[in-house]
Amino acid sequence: MGAVLKIPPPFSLILTCGKDVTMGKYVLKRLVYIVIVFFIISFLMYALYNLIPTDPARAQLEPMRPQLKPDEYFRMYEQLRKEMGLDDHLVIRYARWMGIIKGLKGEFDGLLQGNFGYSQTFKKPVVQQITEPMKNTIFINIFATIAALGITLPLGVYCAVHKGKKFDTTVQTMSILGYSLPIFIISLIFMYFFVVRWGIFPLMGSKTPNASYEPGSWAEFVDKLYHIALPVIVMTFASLGGMTRYVRSSMIEALGTDYIRTARAKGLREKVVIYSHAWRNALLPIITSILAWFLGIFGGSVIIENTFSLNGMGKLYWTGLNTLDFELVLAIQMFYTAVSLIGSLLIDLSYGIVDPRVRVDK
């Protein structure tokens, strides 16, 4: 028998600490990259929106124009542009908007300090305006994500195990159909049956008009859940095709590997082979889509929210674009940029957790 090398406790502790240090260095390096990329994207977005011919000072004074004389209007207009710093260089305005340099009031009051700007459309700070739509978007997407994952993961695994059977063929046909149809077509079909024909769900809105509930009450929760049920069903159905096919293909690839054939040759039970061996190895490519779905909880769907008149982030973003409210649009864009950058780091780290063969530091 060969001698077994045993690592003394102090040395094993050093190796463990070394692994933790390597992980810490990797995370620190990625965080530095995230900060650099965030500043680059923020500057490009700010410069892009400033190329669009809009004038916040003119938009703010326009309602007062009929009551003002031309010379008085022009004088107020020039003064307001100076107060808003619109005549300064693009780089200066960007640095002021980000909070890198002091603002016009002599204070650091930008994006880095939590000041997301002022919405000219809604006449309130952007932070106050996005609070309610963000709550609605998260509320809807949590249910849609849980429902979609709860269906697609077991369905994809079952279709892979029973590849070529009638059930698998039927699911693949329906998946292609659902994947090919635009989501607004799916919305209209579901609205016709569930609202017009059967009258099960309300047509639009996120709560009953003129209904008075105490904030956070059970009645408010049930009413909101009733109103978002149809949008959640539409979002779930629209996402079934792509994710089911992705899970199925990953499982089929895993089931065709040599170690699965070896496990079956050893006489292991089929459930052990599928769920303990094949599923764990098939999970690595799937985890990207799963985490992307969870990160998408914060992102609103422009089409769904406009179709069903839901007060969410997607509809708010669309309103900001239509009304040229670029401080609102930029704030939403920067939030999604930060979520995407942090999400990419979480996806990379999750690879090392799911598959120990992956070297995170590489």
Model-predicted regions and their roles:
Residues 47-51, 174-204, 234-240:
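Membrane-water interface segments at the C-terminal ends of transmembrane alpha-helices
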Residues 24-25, 134-138, 143, 147-167, ...:
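Alpha-helical transmembrane segments of integral membrane proteins
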Residues 1-15, 20:
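Positively charged N-terminal leader segments that act as targeting/secretion signals
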Residues 85-153:
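An internal, D/E-rich "acidic patch" concept
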Residues 38, 42, 46-54, 59, ...:
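Membrane-embedded alpha-helical segments of multi-pass transporters/permeases
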Residues 34, 133, 137, 173-180, ...:
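Residue-level signal for discrete positions within transmembrane alpha-helices
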Residues 38-95, 198-220:
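Hydrophobic alpha-helical transmembrane segments of membrane transport/permease proteins
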Residues 20-35, 265-266:
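N-terminal Sec/SRP start-transfer signal
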